[in-house]
């Protein structure tokens, strides 16, 4: 039986890198999948989180390859400089397609699986010109430009929500198995130093007051510094409200300088970075989240039944549409950072929910995490999909 070579193109921030990592891990957990594959080639930018994560995966799986490429972005801002850059990049686009064609031939790619970011578009054109099969997954309520284009050439289109793209199949989000870690941390007294020292910082923090409402703050590293600063100011001015919470804040790399400011409050616990395994603890034990409105992160939080307060990135349509969907379907809360009363609205929300405790989820979390990946992988490996 001929084995296939798969190309994957995606974006490089955490909640886009981790799903493709999860998809690859899922393949290698199941012999019926990985026995049909000769290699998986990850197309992306080398100086990025995607490269770091992929290199970690490669240590365990020698059939993985990272292919660094130059990428393209269409800028929809109205600034003159953005228009000039778009014109310049359109001339460069031909070169980027040609480099992708070269790498497709080098790695003898049979099929492309892609997501929505600009790094994927030259790769999609290369796949089409070489008559390779294309599978697309769109995670948002409203499709981005790249996937609108890619879906026109795709042999199969999957979405996270209904009615997003024509002729698509709704499978939900691609989520990580690591967020269903079942390690118990109960009944480990601090006096038992050996076991206590084996706990991660996240595990130790859940010996905090269980009667309080647990709030998780999980904005991205990019474009979120002002949000963290606004939250800190709101806490400083309204601590009588926030003292009712145990607050867990993930700062990420670009906001670590705020750690000392948050840490002056005993009920606020900060993390520079959280693994997917520790994310399970945070999602399992927290009641409310304050977050952006990226669909992968929202889906993870809703699996564990959190009440979600969403602050969409103000200049992108997708996050507002995602947030509106969650408001309508789940009764979650949209907090607009462009509103002049943003900080007051935020403190009012947390005053209202200071005694809130979530109900335990009755969902089959394991099935929800596995099903989308199984459907997509079976489509990738189907001989009807890729075999000429």
Name every feature range the model reports, one short phrase each.
Residues 109, 284-297, 306:
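Acidic donor-binding loop of glycosyltransferase active sites
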Residues 11, 78-79, 188-189, 193-288, ...:
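Donor-nucleotide binding loops and adjacent catalytic segments primarily
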Residues 76-111, 129:
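An amphipathic, basic-hydrophobic alpha-helix
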Residues 6-9, 13, 33-92, 269, ...:
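Conserved nucleotide-sugar phosphate-binding/catalytic loop shared by glycosyltransferases and other
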Residues 48-51, 111-130:
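An aromatic- and histidine-rich active-site surface loop
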Residues 129-206:
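Active-site-proximal region of nucleotide-activated glycan assembly enzymes
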Residues 348-355, 367-388:
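C-terminal alpha-helical cap of glycosyltransferases
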């Amino acid at each position: 039986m001929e084995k296939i070579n798969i190309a994957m193109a995606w974006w490089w921030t955490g909640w886009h890198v981790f799903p493709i990592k999860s998809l690859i891990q899922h393949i290698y957990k199941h012999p019926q999948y990985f026995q049909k594959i000769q290699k998986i080639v990850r197309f992306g930018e080398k100086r990025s989180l995607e490269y770091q994560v992929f290199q970690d995966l490669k240590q365990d799986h020698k059939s993985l390859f990272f292919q660094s490429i130059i990428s393209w972005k269409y800028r929809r801002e109205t600034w003159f400089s953005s228009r000039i850059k778009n014109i310049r990049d359109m001339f460069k686009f031909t070169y980027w397609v040609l480099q992708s064609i070269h790498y497709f031939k080098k790695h003898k790619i049979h099929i492309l699986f892609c997501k929505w970011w600009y790094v994927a578009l030259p790769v999609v054109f290369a796949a089409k010109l070489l008559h390779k099969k294309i599978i697309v997954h769109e995670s948002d309520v409203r499709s981005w430009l790249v996937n609108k284009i890619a879906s026109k050439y795709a042999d199969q289109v999957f979405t996270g929500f209904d009615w997003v793209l024509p002729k698509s199949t709704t499978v939900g989000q691609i989520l990580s198995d690591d967020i269903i870690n079942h390690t118990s941390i109960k009944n480990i007294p601090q006096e038992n130093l050996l076991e206590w020292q084996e706990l991660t910082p996240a595990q130790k923090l859940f010996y905090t007051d269980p009667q309080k409402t647990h709030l998780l703050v999980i904005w991205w590293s990019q474009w979120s510094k002002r949000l963290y600063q606004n939250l800190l100011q709101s806490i400083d001015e309204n601590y009588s409200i926030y003292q009712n919470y145990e607050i867990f804040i993930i700062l990420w790399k670009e906001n670590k300088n705020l750690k000392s400011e948050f840490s002056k409050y005993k009920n606020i616990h900060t993390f520079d970075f959280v693994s997917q395994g520790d994310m399970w603890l945070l999602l399992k034990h927290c009641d409310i989240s304050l977050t952006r409105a990226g669909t992968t992160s929202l889906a993870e939080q809703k699996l564990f039944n959190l009440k979600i307060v969403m602050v969409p990135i103000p200049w992108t349509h997708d996050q507002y549409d995602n947030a509106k969907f969650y408001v309508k379907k789940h009764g979650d809360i949209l907090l607009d950072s462009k509103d002049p009363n943003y900080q007051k609205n935020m403190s009012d929300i947390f005053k209202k929910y200071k005694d809130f405790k979530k109900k335990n989820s009755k969902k089959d979390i394991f099935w929800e995490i596995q099903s989308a990946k199984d459907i997509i992988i079976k489509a990738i490996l189907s001989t009807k999909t890729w075999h000429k």
